[in-house]
């Protein structure tokens, strides 16, 4: 049965997946949680009372066991919460299992709540309410893991907040244009903060506040107090603020820049006024420390412990000397955030590839990150990273996550390495495409702990849990194909801001559609052509030998990547009938994601071939009739690919959606694209004399 638009949101509100119990014997050294057991709640109306109710719901919904909640602690067969600050480092927790009691211990109530969620994880891996008689310890390696909403931009229903907390993530992000104002709508920040805090989550303000005054101008302190001081006076519950160049740039006096905000450098003709310099948001300006000092000062008058996170995303491509010079002068009582993989060059299938924006095709840290991580360590500045560890990137923009667990595990291992050598202590786990609980969040939660877990073993347990031990080898083969299909993707900006962003809804345009506008949901933050450009082009791909080799190499590589993804999806699809009904729906969604990614790669393959033939006509290169015939073949192949995508987006309403763009790749947009291409076939390509 086809889902309607936004039906996926109801799935995000399902904190506990139903009917996870399998019939199996109790193992040696295990106990069974039966209806004889009770959950002890403190009775103070606080976090652990809510956590106890959550645990009761888990056992009922997922395991089919009815447990009572009681204030009594003295009886046998009880599950109860303890606070023990001496357990270990901050936020450590333990599930201590004995014959007659399960103690959920944390260094504070939030940690004890995580112990409760760990108990759920242990039972999920067992596929039964069975627990091993042991101490199950966790000590998170990151003090901060933050995500935007995957439900809808800046929208966090209570159940979704609970689901995020179950992922081991402890902070959420909200875009801020003013008090109670995000880019798309108004709402109460204080209400969100209270609801998030109620389930153990902090809230960070992602600043869109406009910094129009230089910090040494007269009245600067009052101006910034009217922005950041005002925000934190009205909403003192914000844990901190994210400051990234493109969103908070100020009129710097650094001579390497325009000295103007980006939009202030656009003339009446729509062209840049100063053309040979970057805007201050895209350069490590020498006066950013001065700007940070005033922003920090006005915020901390209202909240002394506010976490001021300064993110160097926009100038990672600038020379290392200038970047590190800025870090040498930053205040040390802020947090420095550096993007993990960007601006790194490599080869994929012999073709040059560059991680121009968020990607898991480069799971390792880039030179930009490494240089700034070591600089932060030298200065004793707390180090965060933009890692996308919740599982989504711009490799494909309208899927809930990229199901490449091998690549994600490799990234997680490198994150651990930099935790150990440079003190990496925070992670932005996703940008505005948000967080969807998945096998990737299960993997990160289990792996990001101090006790040096075996990531490969964790991954194998996840695959066994979700696909069955009898299907383990086939599942491994399929996910290895997904890993290889994404890893060998040739990353280019024009693809991430083109067909990879919206998938098979991306149109192949010829000559009459040069000003085409992508259809979008009215009021969406990044809808239409704002962050997806339908005018696909290289600078001079047919005349420049290097660009032509890049285009040809990309065509070849994308064909291989698409084939791998579709083959992996076919293997998993063949396993669906062997799974219990309770597992089949989620497994089918993974199949759909894999196939959708494959069809997105195939669309991108066709886009590049189409562009090559189109430009051959422009330059009168070769046999015109042959080029026209090839364009017709490509158009028919892409129409078939788009039609094959329709059942995927019908089955899973999350495919084709991204919170900031809303729906850009769903059935309506795919059908629109097919109509565009059918018109080209019936009109432009049917009249070759034109």
Language-model region placement:
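Contiguous, structured surface segment used for ligand recognition
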Residues: 2-140
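Hydrophobic beta-strand segments of well-ordered beta-sheets in folded domains
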Residues: 34-40, 76-78, 145-147, 170-172, ...
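Solvent-exposed, polar/charged alpha-helical surfaces in well-ordered, non-transmembrane soluble domains
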Residues: 53, 57, 61, 117, ...
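Short, solvent-exposed loop/turn and secondary-structure capping segments
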Residues: 115-116, 253-256, 347-349
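Substrate-binding cleft of carbohydrate-active enzyme catalytic domains
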Residues: 147-148, 152-310, 321-328, 335-338, ...
């Amino acid at each position: 049965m086809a889902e309607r638009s936004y039906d996926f949101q109801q799935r995000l509100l399902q904190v506990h997946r139903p009917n996870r119990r399998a019939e199996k014997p109790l193992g040696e050294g295990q106990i069974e949680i039966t209806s004889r057991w009770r959950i002890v709640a403190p009775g103070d109306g606080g976090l652990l009372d809510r956590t106890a109710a959550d645990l009761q719901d888990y056992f009922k919904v997922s395991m089919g066991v009815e447990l009572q909640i009681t204030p009594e602690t003295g009886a046998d067969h009880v599950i109860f919460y303890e606070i023990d600050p001496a357990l270990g480092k901050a936020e450590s927790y333990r599930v201590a299992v004995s014959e007659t009691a399960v103690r959920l211990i944390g260094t504070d109530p939030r940690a004890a709540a995580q112990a409760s969620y760990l108990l759920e994880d242990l039972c999920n891996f067992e596929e039964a309410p069975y627990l091993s008689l042991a101490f199950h310890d966790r000590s998170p390696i990151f003090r901060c893991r933050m995500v935007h909403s995957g439900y809808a931009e800046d929208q966090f229903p209570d159940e979704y907040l609970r689901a995020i907390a179950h992922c081991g993530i402890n902070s959420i992000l909200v875009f801020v244009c003013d008090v109670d104002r995000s880019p798309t709508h108004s709402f109460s920040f204080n209400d969100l903060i209270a609801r998030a805090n109620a389930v153990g989550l902090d809230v960070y303000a992602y600043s869109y506040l406009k910094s129009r005054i230089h910090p040494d101008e007269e009245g600067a302190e009052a101006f910034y107090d009217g922005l950041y001081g005002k925000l934190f006076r009205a909403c003192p519950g914000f844990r901190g603020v994210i400051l990234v160049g493109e969103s908070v740039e100020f009129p710097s006096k650094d001579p390497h820049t325009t000295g103007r905000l980006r939009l202030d450098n656009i003339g009446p003709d729509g062209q840049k006024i100063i053309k040979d310099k970057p805007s201050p948001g895209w350069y490590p300006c020498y006066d950013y420390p001065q700007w940070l000092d005033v922003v920090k000062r006005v915020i901390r008058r209202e909240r002394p412990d506010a976490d001021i996170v300064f993110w160097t995303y926009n100038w990672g491509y600038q020379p290392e000397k200038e970047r590190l010079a800025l870090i040498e002068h930053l205040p040390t009582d802020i947090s420095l955030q550096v993007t993990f993989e960007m601006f790194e060059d490599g080869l994929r299938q012999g073709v040059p590839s560059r991680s121009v924006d968020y990607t898991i095709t480069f799971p390792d840290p880039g030179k930009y990150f490494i240089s700034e991580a070591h600089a932060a360590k030298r200065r004793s500045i707390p180090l965060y990273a933009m890692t996308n560890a919740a599982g989504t990137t711009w490799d494909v923009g309208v899927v809930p996550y990229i199901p490449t667990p091998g690549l994600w595990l490799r990234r997680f291992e490198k994150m651990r390495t930099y935790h150990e050598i440079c003190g990496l202590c925070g992670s932005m786990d996703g940008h505005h495409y948000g967080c969807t609980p998945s096998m990737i969040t299960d993997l990160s939660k289990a792996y990001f702990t101090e006790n040096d877990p075996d990531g490969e073993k964790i991954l194998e347990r996840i695959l066994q849990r979700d696909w069955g031990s009898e299907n383990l080898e086939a599942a491994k083969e399929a996910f290895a194909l997904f890993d290889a299909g994404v890893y060998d993707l040739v990353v280019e900006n024009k693809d991430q801001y083109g067909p990879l962003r919206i998938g098979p809804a991306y149109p192949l345009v010829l000559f009459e559609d040069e000003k085409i506008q992508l259809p979008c949901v009215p009021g969406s933050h990044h809808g239409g052509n704002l962050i997806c450009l339908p005018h696909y082009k290289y600078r001079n791909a047919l005349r420049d030998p290097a660009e032509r080799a890049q285009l040809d190499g990309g065509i070849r590589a994308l064909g291989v990547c698409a084939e791998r993804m579709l083959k992996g999806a076919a293997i998993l699809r063949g396993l669906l009938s062997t799974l219990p009904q309770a597992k089949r729906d989620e497994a089918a969604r993974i199949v759909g994601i894999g196939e959708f990614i494959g069809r997105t790669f195939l669309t991108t393959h066709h886009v590049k071939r189409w562009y090559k033939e189109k430009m051959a006509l422009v330059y009168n290169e070769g046999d015109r009739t042959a080029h026209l015939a090839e364009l017709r073949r490509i158009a028919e192949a892409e129409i078939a690919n788009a039609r094959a995508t329709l059942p995927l987006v019908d089955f899973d309403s999350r495919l084709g959606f991204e919170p900031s763009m809303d729906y850009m790749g769903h059935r309506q947009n795919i059908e629109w694209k097919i109509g565009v291409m059918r018109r080209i076939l019936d009109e432009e390509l049917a009249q070759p004399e034109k």
